From Swiss-Prot:
Belongs to the methyltransferase superfamily. METTL16/RlmF family. Its main location: cytoplasm. This is Ribosomal RNA large subunit methyltransferase F. Gene3D superfamilies: Vaccinia Virus protein VP39 (3.40.50.150). It catalyses: adenosine(1618) in 23S rRNA + S-adenosyl-L-methionine = N(6)-methyladenosine(1618) in 23S rRNA + S-adenosyl-L-homocysteine + H(+). Its EC number is 2.1.1.181. It comes from Serratia proteamaculans (strain 568). GO terms for molecular function: 23S rRNA (adenine(1618)-N(6))-methyltransferase activity. The keyword Electron transport does not apply. The lineage of its organism: Bacteria, Pseudomonadati, Pseudomonadota, Gammaproteobacteria, Enterobacterales. GO terms for biological process: rRNA base methylation. The gene is rlmF. InterPro entries: METTL16/RlmF (IPR010286), rRNA_lsu_MeTfrase_F (IPR016909), SAM-dependent_MTases_sf (IPR029063). It is found in: Cytoplasm.
Length: 336
């Protein structure tokens, strides 16, 4: 088993007095991530004037938005997508997941580096690279960023018709996405790849933001902790998700461990259809179970890629059924 962990710069402790001191760059984000610098709110407002009412001085006197306010977070995302990725029309239904874009972008940049390891160190670019987004969600974030940064084409699967329709609307209303993003409804929710990947279809990688929690109560407890860190003190029994999220987006029976183990098990029958299978992993304690599942599945290689956003460490696990020689052959056939 191979574990790849990039160097992660340590963040200096911050002393809080009258005003909090923030670094000009966000510690740990991938070097190619467009969001390494602090948010330039005047520039974002120029691109998306609707953001302006949500921008105001915070408790430390810095210009920001209230990250505990779902409407503010949603509008910030809209501005970021318009300013950095040229997306003119973006919206999601109320209460659906509105993910922090810098972290999602990091996943894609590290995924690009992973594909480069199978291609003599060169990142494959263009529409010849096909990515499967498992659970694309209502927000369509991964295709938006992946297409802008690397020119990849995407297929997005989804079990929720409302999410799929939202993603479809985003694709249809933005000409840059129309010919590069396909959407598929998973009509059998008990499956992940079955019913989505065709018999002769090829994907260079899959990615997934799995439902992390094992129950609704666990998801709500996580939200309370986040709101407390944002300085909101006591919160309601059923707190409002600042980044949104419907049940199927946030939790499933057995949590991320059960979901990703199932993904590994299903990937066996799709071994020749995909070069790299990947999934985000929220909890470090989940990793041994995933490694064990990969060993039972007979994978050729497993990698753990760690990422950092400030003091928060995240990671994704990647596995392939192709050895080094087969990876090189795959790259030669599809990317050159």
């Amino acid at each position: 088993m191979v574990s790849y962990v990039p160097e992660i710069p340590l963040r200096e402790p911050v002393t809080v007095e009258k005003k909090k001191s923030f670094p000009q760059q966000k510690s740990g984000l991938h070097p190619r991530n467009r969001h390494r610098s602090r948010y330039d709110f005047p520039a974002l407002i120029a691109s998306c004037p609707a953001l302006e009412p949500f921008v105001k001085p915070n408790a430390w006197g810095d210009i920001s938005v209230d990250f505990a306010d779902p409407a503010a977070v949603k509008m910030l995302n809209r501005a970021l997508l318009q300013h950095f990725y040229g997306i003119e029309h973006w919206d999601i239904p109320a209460d659906y997941l509105c993910p922090p874009i810098p972290g999602r972008a990091d996943y894609l940049h590290h995924l690009a580096d992973l594909l480069a390891t199978s291609n003599d160190g060169e990142i494959p670019r263009g529409k010849g690279v096909a990515i499967l987004d498992v659970g694309i969600g209502a927000n369509c974030i991964y295709p938006i960023v992946g297409l802008r940064e690397y020119g990849w084409r995407f297929t997005g699967s989804e079990i929720d018709p409302v999410s799929l329709n939202s993603a479809k609307m985003i694709v249809e209303m933005n000409p840059t996405l129309r010919n590069s993003v396909r959407l598929r409804l998973q009509k059998q929710p008990e499956f992940i790849f079955n019913g989505i990947i065709g018999v002769a279809e090829k994907f260079d990688a899959t990615l997934c933001n799995p439902p992390f929690h094992g129950s609704e109560q666990e998801a709500q407890a996580s939200t309370r902790r986040k709101l407390h860190k944002l300085g909101k003190g006591e919160v309601a029994d059923k707190p409002v998700q600042n980044f949104g999220g419907k049940n199927n987006e946030l939790w499933c029976e057995g949590g991320e461990e059960a979901f990703v183990r199932k993904m590994v098990e299903e990937s066996v029958s799709k071994a020749q259809n995909c070069l790299w299978f990947t999934s985000l992993i929220s909890k470090h304690t989940t990793l041994p179970s995933i490694y064990h599942a990969a060993k039972l599945a007979g994978v050729a290689e497993v990698r753990t890629i760690e990422m950092a956003q400030g003091q928060k460490i995240s990671r994704f696990v990647a596995w392939t059924f192709h050895d080094a020689e087969q990876q090189a052959a795959w790259a030669a056939e599809r990317w050159r």
